[in-house]
Swiss-Prot record:
Nucleotide-binding recorded as keyword: yes
A GO CC term attached to the entry: cytosol
InterPro entries listed in its UniProt record: DUF520, UPF0234-like_C, UPF0234_N, YajQ-like_sf
Coiled coil regions, renumbered to chain: none
SUPFAM superfamilies associated with the record: YajQ-like
Family per record: Belongs to the YajQ family.
Keyword Nucleotide-binding found: yes
GO MF annotation, one: nucleotide binding
Domain of life: Bacteria
Keyword annotations: Nucleotide-binding
Task performed by this protein: Nucleotide-binding protein.
Lineage: Bacteria, Pseudomonadati, Pseudomonadota, Betaproteobacteria, Neisseriales
Protein's name according to its UniProt entry: Nucleotide-binding protein CV_2047
C-alpha cells in the first residue's frame, strides 16, 4: 500500500551556511562599522545582537534574505521578544520550529478526511503518515496539502513530503 510522510523540517546545514553568509555581510557593511551586530546559532535557536533596534531590524532583514536564497522557509522561525542586554545593546532570539505541532497535524488529518479522498492519515509523533490504494490518489493529497496548508502565508507551515513508497 503506497504511503508518504508529511513533516516540517529545517535543513540545518543550509541554515548554518545562510548564517555564515549573513555574519560575513554584517561584518563588512559600512553602516555596521564599530557596532556589535552579529548572529549566533545553536541547534534550536538563532540569536541576533545589535546596538540599536534599527540595526537589529537590518540584521534580521539580511538573515531573512540569506535564508531565502538558500531555500530555507522563513516561516520555520518563531520570533521572540526584543530584549535589552548590557549597555544600550539589544538582542532577539529566533527559535527554529521543527516537526508538526499537534494542532497542525490534526488540521492535516481533518483536511484529508473532509476531502473525501480514499486515503488514511495517521499522526505519528511529529509527522503525519498518509497511505492510500493508488499512487495517483497520494499525489492528489500532496497537491491538496500544498494548496491548503503550505501556501497559507499567515499561519501555514513549511511542509515536506518524504518517504514516498509504493
Amino acid at each position: 500500500m503506497p504511503s508518504f510522510d508529511v513533516v516540517s523540517e529545517v535543513n540545518k546545514v543550509e541554515v548554518r551556511n545562510a548564517l555564515d553568509q549573513a555574519n560575513k555581510e554584517v561584518s563588512t557593511r559600512y553602516d555596521f562599522k564599530g557596532s556589535d551586530a552579529r548572529i549566533e546559532f545553536n541547534d534550536k535557536e538563532v540569536t541576533l545582537f545589535a546596538d540599536t533596534e534599527f540595526q537589529l531590524d537590518q540584521v534580521n532583514d539580511i538573515l531573512v534574505n540569506k535564508l531565502s536564497k538558500r531555500s530555507v522557509d522563513v516561516r520555520s522561525l518563531d520570533y521572540g521578544k526584543l530584549e535589552k542586554v548590557s549597555g544600550n545593546k539589544v538582542k532577539k532570539v529566533l527559535k527554529i520550529k521543527e516537526g508538526l505541532d499537534s494542532d497542525l497535524a490534526k488540521k492535516i488529518v481533518k483536511l484529508l478526511k473532509d476531502s473525501k479522498m480514499k486515503v488514511q492519515a495517521s499522526i505519528q509523533g511529529e509527522a503525519v503518515r498518509v497511505s492510500g490504494a493508488k499512487r495517483d490518489v497520494l499525489q492528489e493529497a500532496i497537491a491538496l496539502l500544498k494548496a491548503e496548508i503550505a501556501s497559507d502565508l499567515e499561519n501555514g507551515a513549511p511542509l515536506q513530503f518524504n518517504n514516498f513508497r509504493d
